[in-house]
């Protein structure tokens, strides 16, 4: 039997210097993906070394948004079938994408060997990185992956239409007892549209009424990165992987941050 307590302690030592800022971004609609692509590239161009774990498949991925090709998944590097450099998709100065759709699924219920190899891979990826982004893809029942759920901050990016907002609400309402007391919300496109703003206002009211979660409107990803940095002290860095493993073991999106 795997003893996850011992496993977490060992992996925590492997990843003691976890990246200072980890932000998950859930996008709903093609304009939302383009918003993330633009914000990630802007931050990297300004000097922030950024690593992206892209849990979204080929269609709707950041590589797709940048018109780039991805051959391998991070899981293949973790399993040592290919080198880590073969997985990396360079999307601009300081911006490296790692397709991770298969990796995200494999983390749920990961055995000891896979978890240890994942931690070792993370240790390599954190070298020189200022920001880790997780382009989150929720499951059909709107549950986040262990990696996405363990981030310091969650950003939900919506378009100004009912379909996008409804899907976003389906995810957010699952997080009522989750790790974030506040979730960042960005509107991609249609910022001046009265209808879009009305939808966003209604979303915020519904979320607050039914889950108690507060939605904070943001225009730039920088705001979320700064908020993530505020909780990225030494103790928090040591707990990051522990949270990933906790979610992996429970298959749950409601594991709260331990203080």
Place the predicted regions along the sequence by residue.
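Hydrophobic alpha-helical segments and helix pairs
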Residues: 89-126
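Structural motif
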Residues: 25-30, 53-58, 99-103, 135-138, ...
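Phosphate-binding loop that captures ATP/GTP phosphates
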Residues: 3-15, 50, 55-100
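Conserved catalytic-core segment of NTP-binding enzymes
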Residues: 114-220
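Short, flexible loop segments at the rims of nucleotide/cofactor-binding pockets, characterized by
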Residues: 29, 74-75, 108-112, 132-135
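Walker A (P-loop) phosphate-binding motif
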Residues: 6-58
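C-terminal lobe/tail of nucleotide-utilizing enzymes
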Residues: 1-23, 181-259
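Signal for well-folded cores of large energy- and translation-related assemblies
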Residues: 16, 41-44, 79, 89, ...
């Amino acid at each position: 039997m795997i003893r996850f307590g011992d496993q977490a302690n060992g992996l925590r030592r492997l990843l003691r210097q976890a990246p200072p800022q980890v932000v998950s971004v859930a996008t709903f609609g093609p304009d939302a993906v383009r918003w993330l692509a633009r914000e990630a590239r802007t931050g990297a161009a300004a000097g922030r070394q950024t690593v992206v774990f892209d849990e979204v498949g080929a269609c709707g991925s950041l590589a797709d948004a940048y018109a780039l090709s991805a051959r391998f998944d991070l899981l293949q590097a973790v399993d040592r079938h290919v080198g880590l450099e073969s997985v990396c998709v360079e999307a601009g100065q300081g911006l490296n994408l790692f397709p991770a759709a298969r990796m995200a699924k494999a983390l749920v219920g990961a055995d000891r060997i896979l978890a240890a190899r994942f931690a070792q891979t993370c240790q390599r990826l954190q070298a020189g990185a200022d920001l880790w982004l997780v382009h989150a893809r929720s499951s059909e029942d709107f549950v986040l992956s262990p990696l996405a759920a363990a981030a310091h901050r969650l950003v939900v990016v919506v378009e100004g239409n009912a379909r996008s907002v409804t899907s976003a609400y389906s995810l957010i309402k699952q997080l009522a007892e989750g790790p974030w007391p506040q979730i960042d919300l960005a509107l991609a496109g249609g910022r001046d549209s009265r209808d879009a703003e009305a939808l966003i206002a209604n979303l915020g009211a519904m979320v607050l009424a039914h889950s108690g979660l507060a939605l904070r409107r943001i225009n730039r990803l920088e705001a979320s990165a700064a908020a993530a940095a505020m909780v990225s002290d030494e103790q928090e860095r040591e707990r990051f992987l522990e949270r990933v493993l906790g979610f992996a073991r429970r298959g749950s999106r409601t594991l709260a941050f331990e203080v």
